[in-house]
Amino acid sequence: MLRWLTAGESHGPALVAVLEGLPAGVEITTTQIGDALARRRLGYGRGARMSFERDEVRLLGGVRHGLTQGGPIAVEIGNTEWPKWETVMAADPVDPAALTGARGAPLTRPRPGHADLIGMTKYGFDEARPVLERASARETASRVALGRVAAAFLEQAAGVRLVSHVVAIGPVSAPDDADLPTPDDVAALDADPIRCFDAATSAAMVAEIDDAQKAGDTLGGVVEVLAYGLPPGLGSYVQSDRRLDGRLAGVLMGIQAIKGVEVGDGFRTAARRGSAAHDEIERATDGRVRRRTNRAGGVEGGMTNGEVLRVRAAMKPISTVPRALDTIDTATGDAAKAIHQRSDVCAVAPAAVVAEAMVALVLAQALLEKVGGDSVAESARNLTSYLEAIPEQQR
């Protein structure tokens, strides 16, 4: 079974991630992982941290000479800012006198919409520093690193490729009939300041972010992930926890600030009658069985149906609002303004990259459940055997 785990704090020495269960023989390098992490730093409206932060990637285990070895893969992402935080974030006890100053000051004015206050309550902290350090979206760098490894397996074992893009920033949305990007469009998307596939919409999104920044505010939006080349039958209908759409929704909702997920046309289908909500089946001119439309987003009954997988995630505005929302000071109980940590105005573009990584991990997990394999070559052979066994009338 493919599984993953991450550890580390936002301003700690490093983030660490482990991916267990991936077959041997997958081609992957630190450069490829570093490139994926660089994509996570893209996007108009990012904070100052993105301009000087660098992700120092080291593969600590599971990869030799550019090939996975079949054992757990361990990735370390070093924090170039660590020397500035070494005392504040030290693992061992430090002299309280050494914590005087801005970085070491207790954070007792929790931010509305963030994990701060509830995290303090749940874990018994008297300030928010331990909470925000782990709850920070910086942690997603770990998942992007692992997602890049999973994406390499998907492409090499099954020819599956993914792409993500931004479809809305605040009230500005791409047209419903806008063209969908393909994996061949990744470079063009990454060159766009918003990672939006529609140029006119992208320009309007930039203007919306500028307005929010001038107002001392933040913005959310909607991202979409597409997976091309998926075989039918990944996932299952026999138990709720094996349904692929439920698993995708779970990992996407697990991304910081994501508050909603839809597969295919999702919430829009709720306003339609059944005759206009489902994808009719036909035999195409090439002889293959296909759906005339893809309102289901490539998933029916909790399983891939051979069409393009299409999932969206809605991100709320960042909770670190520059103009500071009302809160309380937990040290005194008095009314106060929330703390303002260095933050972004809009982080929807990087959220798309994180969502892409999480979709890759779940799809790799589902593919391995279906075809198995201790090497990527064996997984590919097993997939070919499965596809060849599908009755001709159902292909």
UniProtKB/Swiss-Prot annotation:
Its required cofactor(s), as named, are: FMNH2
Q: List the disulfide bonds.
A: none
Q: Which Pfam families match?
A: Chorismate_synt (PF01264)
Entry superkingdom: Bacteria
Quote the record's cofactor note.
Reduced FMN (FMNH(2)).
**Would you tell me the Gene Ontology cellular component terms?**
cytosol
- Where FMN is bound, by residue? R134, A135, S136, Q256, A257, G301, K316, P317, I318, S319, T320, R342
**Could you tell me what this protein does?**
This reaction introduces a second double bond into the aromatic ring system.
Q: What is this protein called?
A: Chorismate synthase
Q: Which organism is it from?
A: Beutenbergia cavernae (strain ATCC BAA-8 / DSM 12333 / CCUG 43141 / JCM 11478 / NBRC 16432 / NCIMB 13614 / HKI 0122)
List the top taxonomic levels of the source: Bacteria, Bacillati, Actinomycetota, Actinomycetes, Micrococcales
